[in-house]
């Protein structure tokens, strides 16, 4: 492939990603969500000046931290927290993350200290681990080969463009959900657990994971459409892009498990409300991924 960049190529478009951040307040517990959208702009000249044309035939190189996070998707999330202190009898009096429906029912019935956040986290863990095999498949970059019709580059670009639009729509819907009075209201007063509503907490946790299911379906669509061999790198780069929300969910759920563990360590020895660090749900696209995806759009829509 020639590395020459024509005037027409310089005037072509590159896709970008718009990041929408919603903060998680330490008391309101609003997860921070990054949505994604598509930006069209004439920025190919800068890309062409810094990248060789041959790079389009190689998948975007995953940074070590992003790869490690994606590797974690191949395994179930272990809710057992890393302990600050050796466990003792007092620790057992504080809520733990429930990994089975029976444990969840017991948690709701007994309502030990920190039960609202343990209940919320338990639903997330059970729903997430219930789709572990599917997450493992998308993290592996599984691309089935078929004997039927296959998408060419232009056809797959249209599908990818639609998928990015769907990601953006999901982000907007999730934005509204996270900011709704019902989300915060389910947990009641920050310093009065008796005002929390167990059914409401289960409902919002399940709805949060319904969005996770939607992101997962989009990742499967992006990765598993049959394409011609010259489009496989485009699929790989779009697959990395589609993993960003799923990686963000995994990290958020793991952090929530850690916060429950910190409550187990601290609550038995505190006479007042314990304030823990924020937990955030971030879906940032790693550096360079935006340019790689945009270059593939340019390549096939030129």
List the model feature ranges, each with a label:
Residues 5-7, 23, 56:
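Terminal single-pass membrane anchor helices
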Residues 1-15:
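Juxtamembrane interface helix immediately N-terminal to a transmembrane segment
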Residues 31-42:
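Hydrophobic core segments of alpha-helical transmembrane domains in multi-pass membrane proteins
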Residues 46-171, 175:
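N-terminal topogenic membrane-targeting module
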Residues 166, 170-293:
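Soluble C-terminal extramembrane regulatory/interaction domains of multi-pass membrane proteins
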Residues 62-64, 299-302:
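Acidic, glycine/proline-rich intrinsically disordered low-complexity segments
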Residues 18-28:
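Hydrophobic alpha-helical transmembrane segments
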């Amino acid at each position: 492939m020639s590395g020459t960049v024509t005037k027409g190529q310089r005037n072509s478009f590159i896709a970008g990603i718009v990041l929408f951040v919603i903060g998680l307040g330490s008391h309101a517990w609003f997860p921070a969500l990054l949505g994604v959208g598509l930006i069209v702009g004439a920025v190919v000249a800068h890309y062409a000046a810094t990248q060789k044309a041959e790079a389009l035939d190689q998948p975007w190189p995953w940074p070590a931290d992003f790869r490690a996070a994606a590797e974690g998707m191949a395994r179930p999330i272990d809710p057992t927290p890393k302990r600050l202190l050796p466990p003792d009898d007092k620790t057992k009096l504080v809520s733990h993350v429930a990994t089975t429906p029976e444990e969840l029912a017991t948690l709701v019935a007994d309502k030990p200290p920190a039960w609202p956040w343990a209940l919320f986290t338990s639903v997330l863990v059970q729903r997430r681990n219930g789709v572990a095999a599917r997450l493992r498949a998308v993290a592996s970059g599984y691309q089935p080969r078929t004997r039927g019709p296959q998408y060419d580059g232009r056809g797959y670009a249209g599908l990818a463009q639609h998928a990015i639009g769907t990601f953006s729509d999901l982000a907007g819907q999730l934005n509204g959900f996270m900011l709704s009075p019902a989300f915060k209201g389910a947990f009641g007063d920050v310093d009065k657990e008796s005002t929390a509503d167990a059914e409401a907490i289960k409902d919002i946790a399940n709805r949060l994971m319904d969005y996770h299911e939607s992101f997962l379906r989009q990742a499967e669509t992006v990765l598993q459409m049959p394409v011609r061999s010259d489009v496989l790198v485009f699929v790989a780069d779009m697959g990395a892009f589609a993993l960003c929300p799923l990686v963000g969910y995994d990290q958020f759920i793991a952090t929530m498990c850690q916060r429950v563990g910190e409550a187990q360590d601290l609550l038995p020895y505190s006479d007042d409300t314990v304030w823990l660090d924020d937990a955030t749900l971030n879906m940032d696209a790693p550096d360079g991924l935006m340019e790689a995806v945009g270059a593939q759009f340019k390549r096939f829509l030129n």
